[in-house]
Amino acid sequence: MITVVKRNGRIEPLDITKIQKYTKDATDNLEGVSQSELEVDARLQFRDKITTEEIQQTLIKTAVDKIDIDTPNWSFVASRLFLYDLYHKVSGFTGYRHLKEYFENAEEKGRILKGFKEKFDLEFLNSQIKPERDFQFNYLGIKTLYDRYLLKDANNHPIELPQHMFMSIAMFLAQNEQELNKIALEFYEVLSKFEAMCATPTLANARTTKHQLSSCYIGSTPDNIEGIFDSYKEMALLSKYGGGIGWDFSLVRSIGSYIDGHKNASAGTIPFLKIANDVAIAVDQLGTRKGAIAVYLEIWHIDVMEFIDLRKNSGDERRRAHDLFPALWVCDLFMKRVLEDAMWTLFDPYECKDLTELYGQDFEKRYLEYEKDPKIIKEYINAKDLWKKILMNYFEAGLPFLAFKDNANRCNPNAHAGIIRSSNLCTEIFQNTAPNHYYMQIEYTDGAIEFFEEKELVTTDSNITKCANKLTSTDILKGKKIYIATKVAKDGQTAVCNLASINLSKINTEEDIKRVVPIMVRLLDNVIDLNFYPNRKVKATNLQNRAIGLGVMGEAQMLAEHQIAWGSKEHLEKIDALMEQISYHAIDTSANLAKEKGVYKDFENSEWSKGIFPIDKANNEALKLTEKGLFNHACDWQGLREKVKANGMRNGYLMAIAPTSSISILVGTTQTIEPIYKKKWFEENLSGLIPVVVPNLNVETWNFYTSAYDIDAKDLIKAAAVRQKWIDQGQSINVFLRIENASGKTLHEIYTLAWKLGLKSTYYLRSESPSIDEKSVLDRSVECFNCQ
């Protein structure tokens, strides 16, 4: 008699009918698969004391190996088999235990934050859990959920099932609501039906003892040693808790600049960037992956040429930073000089600091004044030559990222409260930031303390006038001897990204958008108050502007299922209509929340307060891409303007489209706003290579799934421009180009078009041609984990 060893160690006789029940359940109601084919191809070699786990893994591997373009449903067979195995690991049977048991077990193991479950009616919420929704997962989706998101104990044993995860996240994010059971259920319904999804940090950490829910952070470094090294500390803390980082270094004086009155004393930004590179490597996010830091520099900075070469493998290694992601902050004036084939002047920010505070006409006026000033240090380069160098690096390495300073700031709804200095790691977040401000703290021998600005002139009792930062313990002020003079900081602003995405493959009607968008805006607004913040400054900034970033994913699937060709007129009209609805209901919800919970602190004098919305500042050329133009809008925008003026806004920033690769895999849709990579490819996982087929591939959708490399890159830019009309922040936009189609002229046309159509940024240039080998593996090594 052949026996099997169960997971609990019990030995019992082999019962073939149990295996057949599993294989039948796994293949039921799925086209193109069969129970008998699964059992035959598994070639199970039964032997005495074979483990049930081995049988299960063999069946899963068999199903995975059968996933192909003409048989995509084997992915759902593999997912069901994996789920049956997961149920037994977590519950001890094929199903769910009570929600209360799940919480008590996870709390006992120290994995769930204590104290919030008691606020809820657990009996009611348990009755609303829908285990059948687990069958929405394809195999890569459930594997991704298991590997990255489901809670595990100290021995890496899973203690959570998918629907419990969605419900506990919903409860955590609804715990401060008045009608908390109702709101928790609304959150659960949207998440568990894959109608929308939170970004990775929220999915992974909401409900846990370390509830760091934000995706990434954006900061700025001042031009002094104290500020530069305070920035490293801040980056380290933010990276420690899993945040991606975008950081502006444009204020740091250039190579050859003055230090303490001595010319040619400064080594410039590059040595400081090298230290930032070491921070990214040293603070490696719990040992799972190195930190991810994008560094931004204004294009007029004297160090720009070296900055572009930051990741080059040749040259002086002391002036290289191979693990940073360089990004250029590009102004309109530079792009105009490129088109005019004119000269471009580079400056030292030590002498031209105010250029970092200006944009548009004010920037151009000041820049021209500096060009004429003979006392200012400057260097000259042909603008077109610099542009060629940028594009060549972009083609060879996919970097530096490009972000357009004036496009970003022209459409900043909070321009009254600051300036946008850079974007984030994935180039979709655009919010005000500010470096720390440093001043002098003078402590006297009698214990008294007095404060001065660094450059404030002070006259000592010896009748010597000097800047406050030159005071020492030998000085006496008004009869009081100085004990020590130190430099102290007043916090600037470090912006925060709290992200989620609407799944367009499921939510693409006016009725559904009207239902789902308000739920997700409320959810993201709650993230702000329930988040764990790594330091005081980021919390203060987030509470000041209450920024969120609602985006979309699944655009390619939605288009294919509606039989709309990418880049067609129908495509642009469709996304124009969808983005109008999403923008309208996001703003409307924020206005409703403002009435319910209060306005964000900087609302007064903002563009919102004047009834000026993103569409009102849309790029004129982008408006011409669809017939809608300035008119024929489907929504009552005038009524909403009056409502916002009356109610205010809960959130200073509302929309941003992030990359979403992880969460789009999770819900089984196409990535963000991008076309597909191929109809079939392989994802690398801890388990090996997993075949993936685009969702819902069939006779009707086949011709409408077009590879990104077969689409004119300018069509990607035009589609992005149509979306951008409705978005207050930005989009993470990759450009795809076959190597054989690449040329300097082509790259120039693509990126100048992006600028002309009002885009705020572009992300990677993916120029490698997809392999003709069937085993094409999608490279995700360069992607930001946190914005997904």
Swiss-Prot record:
**Catalysed conversion reaction:** a 2'-deoxyribonucleoside 5'-diphosphate + [thioredoxin]-disulfide + H2O = a ribonucleoside 5'-diphosphate + [thioredoxin]-dithiol
**Positions of dTTP binding:** D223, N224, I225, R253
User: What is one cellular component GO term in this UniProt entry?
Assistant: ribonucleoside-diphosphate reductase complex
The catalytic activity of this protein is classed by the Enzyme Commission as 1.17.4.1
Q: How is its activity regulated?
A: Under complex allosteric control mediated by deoxynucleoside triphosphates and ATP binding to separate specificity and activation sites on the alpha subunit. The type of nucleotide bound at the specificity site determines substrate preference. It seems probable that ATP makes the enzyme reduce CDP and UDP, dGTP favors ADP reduction and dTTP favors GDP reduction. Stimulated by ATP and inhibited by dATP binding to the activity site.
Task: Check the record and name the Pfam families matching this protein.
Answer: ATP-cone (PF03477), Ribonuc_red_lgC (PF02867), Ribonuc_red_lgN (PF00317)
Q: List the residues marked with site Important for electron transfer.
A: Y763, Y764
> Which sites bind ATP?
K6, E12, P13, L14, D15, I16, T17, K18, T52
What the entry lists under PANTHER family is as follows:
RIBONUCLEOSIDE-DIPHOSPHATE REDUCTASE LARGE CHAIN (PTHR11573), RIBONUCLEOSIDE-DIPHOSPHATE REDUCTASE LARGE SUBUNIT (PTHR11573:SF6)
UniProt subunit comment: Tetramer of two alpha and two beta subunits.
Record protein name field: Ribonucleoside-diphosphate reductase subunit alpha
The species this protein was found in:
Helicobacter pylori (strain J99 / ATCC 700824)
Per the UniProt record, the lineage of the source organism begins with: Bacteria, Pseudomonadati, Campylobacterota, Epsilonproteobacteria, Campylobacterales
